[in-house]
Regions:
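Phosphate-binding and adjacent anionic-ligand microenvironments
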Residues: 10, 14-179, 185-203
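Cysteine protease catalytic core and zymogen-processing segment of caspase-like enzymes
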Residues: 1-11
Length: 203
């Protein structure tokens, strides 16, 4: 999605809001900031992105699972659209996908990501879980200060270096999902270890 955003702005000259789910990379935010574009964060589920697309002239919307949509297209996650857009990006740039990824990482990365699903033995009360995670919120994780906490969907700790850790119950399965994005693989591992310990305390 980050590659698509850069292409739409720099090659097509598009402007407008960017919408992403809470579990999607913050590289998008850093790139959008360079272009002075607003970013809206939604709960997980493309229906929340679609709500924005139906109300505003959204440039691009997407989620962690790979579903995206762009201005003028249907307000629904479309993997075929993403595939076609990637082909266009590669053709226009003359670069390989690997080189494009390296280039975007040099601009707004690096970013490493991991997700783990913890199987629940009993249902989790979402509000009770959220309150527990807020009450026990750490001052720092893996040596980075927690600078912001989002509760738009689960609880997301955002760190000073723009790394983040998200703990949220799945809306479709009896699992608790733990997500982390960090600047190094070691940072991601440390955040996941912390997140899984905390998540286990509420399962």
């Amino acid at each position: 999605m980050t590659l698509a955003l850069r292409h739409l702005v720099e090659r097509r000259g598009w402007r407008g809001p960017v919408v992403r789910t809470v579990s999607t990379t913050r590289m998008i935010d850093r790139l959008a900031q360079r272009y002075h574009l607003p970013v809206y964060e939604t709960p997980v589920g493309f229906n929340y992105i679609a709500d924005y697309m139906l109300k505003e002239d959204v440039l691009i919307g997407g989620e962690e699972s790979g579903g995206i949509s762009i201005r003028g297209h249907i307000p629904e996650g479309d993997g075929i659209l993403m595939g076609l857009l990637l082909i266009e990006i590669i053709a226009v740039s003359g670069s390989s996908l690997a080189d494009l990824v390296d280039d975007i990482h040099s601009q707004v990365g690096p970013a490493f990501y991991q997700r783990n699903d913890l199987r629940l033995v009993r249902p989790v009360a979402k509000e009770q879980m959220k309150q527990h995670l807020l009450d026990s919120a750490p001052a720092d994780i893996a040596g980075e200060t927690v600078v912001q906490i989002s509760t738009i969907d689960g609880v997301k700790y955002i760190l000073a270096d723009d790394s983040w850790l998200l703990i949220r119950p799945s809306g479709t399965e009896p699992v608790l999902r733990v997500y982390a994005e960090g600047r190094t693989p070691e940072m991601v591992k440390a955040m996941m270890n912390y997140g899984e310990r905390v998540a286990a305390s509420v399962t």
